[in-house]
């Protein structure tokens, strides 16, 4: 459909359809507000999908229109018989054809890259809000994160709660919590809150509050996080007392056997790791930790703290800065990200499809976590991750939620009842459960 007239007709037609679809969506939203039953909810979902599909098609046709107009302009230009663009510096034509023109006007190179954030400014901003609005926003961006991001992609949203307000000249005004929901092309400012940065900073500042309210991201729920955190103090204490395969202490003659035994334990390896971390501090993160210590936040100062694993309950995409200098914490997050990759690999392996389709269902949480955490100024100790995997890997895999299928006999019975009922009320072919 290269003809401009045809494309314009399609754009007009789709715009008309979109107006009707949006009106139907509004009607469906009103119906759900009045009577939120399953039928109205499914109708609302269908209307949302229709609007989304029409918007995508309309955007595609507008893109085609822009390309066609651009091509037409290019066609009217006098062409160089050599096929070289007028402003190309090559004397002879390249073997490559000319591609798209990339407009970089919107990019600000003074801003830091996506992997860098101003954690101190972000932390001070978040700590300035009341705990209820912070935890409710965390719930919306973790437990209900996928839905929230999908509905608000490409916008800067505001969370509002009655507990969050400010007095201006005696007038009480809501104090909104702003979070940006970027698309893949968005450029984020260093102090700008995104869902990933918000989860990271809040998980690091308020793990005790998260633990008390049992707020958990679905991706952590399916790898058995609830099982893992049960009896955490006893679990980590036992782990610390076990012999570490990476330590070979230099024992002087006459050293008591009890002391020799202690020097071989995981606890000693963690103490050595803590010494390394103490020498690698970044000034901004130290400033944030000091600021947080003066207020309500409950950041763990030791991996044996009861709330330590809850730092990762909402699946932050890196180790939170407030506990990055606690030995074993960054590696614990890496252990969870490997478990997520392991579960996704198991799920991809059991699905039907080509090898390429299965490969698409695999994930790389670990690589992403590693890259983001190391961008904050520390190197992860792979040996600690290995110790975690040796200690807890098998039992965690046994507690994965793999969406197990129905019992074959139960499925057969349910299907026969469906078939029978459909035949009674209709001449249509019954669907499979």
From Swiss-Prot:
The record's region (Viral RNA-binding) falls at 175-217
Q: What is its main location?
A: virion
Region listing for Chaperone activity, in residue ranges: 1-100
Q: Which GO terms describe its molecular function?
A: endonuclease activity; RNA binding
Q: Where in the cell is it found?
A: Virion; Host cytoplasm, Host perinuclear region; Host Golgi apparatus, Host cis-Golgi network
Could you name the Gene Ontology cellular component terms for this entry?
helical viral capsid; host cell Golgi apparatus; host cell perinuclear region of cytoplasm; ribonucleoprotein complex; viral nucleocapsid
Which gene produces this protein? N
Please verify whether the record's keywords include Ligase: no
Q: What is this protein called?
A: Nucleoprotein
> So what EC number does this one have?
3.1.-.-
Whom does it interact with, and what assembly results? Homotrimer. Homomultimer. Homomultimerizes and binds to viral genomic RNA to form the nucleocapsid. Interacts with host MAP1LC3B; this interaction participates to the protection of Gn from virus-triggered autophagy. Interacts with host SNAP29; this interaction participates to the protection of glycoprotein N from virus-triggered autophagy. Interacts (via N-terminus) with host RPS19; this interaction probably mediates the loading of the 40S ribosomal subunit on viral capped mRNA during N-mediated translation initiation. Interacts with the viral RdRp. Interacts with host SUMO1 (via N-terminus).
């Amino acid at each position: 459909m290269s003809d401009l007239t045809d494309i314009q007709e399609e754009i007009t037609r789709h715009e008309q359809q979109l107006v009707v679809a949006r009106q139907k969506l509004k009607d469906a939203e009103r119906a759900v507000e009045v009577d939120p039953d399953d039928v109205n909810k499914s109708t609302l979902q269908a209307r949302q999908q229709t609007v989304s599909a029409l918007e995508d098609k309309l955007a595609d046709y507008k893109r085609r229109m822009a390309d066609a107009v651009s091509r037409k302009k290019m066609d009217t230009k006098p062409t160089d018989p050599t096929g070289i663009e007028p402003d190309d510096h090559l004397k002879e034509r390249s073997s490559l054809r000319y591609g798209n023109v990339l407009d970089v006007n919107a990019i600000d190179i003074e801003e830091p890259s996506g992997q860098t954030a101003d954690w101190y400014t972000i932390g001070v901003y978040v700590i300035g809000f009341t705990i209820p609005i912070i935890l409710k926003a965390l719930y919306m961006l973790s437990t209900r994160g996928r839905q929230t991001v999908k509905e608000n992609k490409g916008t800067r949203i505001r969370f509002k709660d009655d507990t969050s307000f400010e007095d201006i000249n005696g007038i009480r005004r809501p104090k909104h919590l702003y979070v940006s929901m970027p698309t893949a092309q968005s450029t984020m400012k260093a102090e700008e809150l995104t869902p990933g940065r918000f989860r990271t900073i809040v998980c690091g500042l308020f793990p005790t509050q998260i633990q008390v309210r049992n707020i958990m991201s679905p991706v952590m729920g399916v790898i058995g996080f609830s099982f893992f955190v049960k009896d955490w103090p006893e679990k980590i204490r036992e782990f610390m007392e076990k012999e570490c395969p990476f330590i070979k202490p230099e024992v002087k003659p006459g050293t008591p056997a009890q002391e020799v035994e202690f020097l071989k334990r995981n606890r000693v390896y963690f103490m050595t790791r803590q010494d390394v971390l103490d020498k690698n501090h970044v000034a901004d993160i130290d400033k944030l930790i000091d600021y947080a210590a003066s207020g309500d936040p409950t950041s763990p100062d030791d991996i044996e703290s009861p709330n330590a694993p809850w730092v990762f309950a909402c699946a932050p995409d890196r180790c939170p800065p407030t506990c990055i200098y606690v030995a074993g914490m960054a590696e614990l997050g890496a252990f969870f990200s490997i478990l997520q990759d392991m579960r996704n690999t198991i799920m991809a392996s059991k699905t039907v499809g080509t090898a390429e389709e299965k490969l698409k269902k695999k994930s790389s949480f670990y690589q992403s976590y590693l890259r983001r955490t190391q961008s904050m100024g520390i190197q992860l100790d792979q040996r600690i991750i290995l110790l975690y995997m040796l200690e807890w890997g098998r039992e965690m895999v046994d507690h994965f939620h793999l969406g197990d299928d129905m019992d074959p006999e139960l499925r057969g019975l349910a299907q026969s009842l469906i078939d029978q009922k459909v035949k009674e009320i209709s001449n249509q072919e019954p669907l499979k459960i």
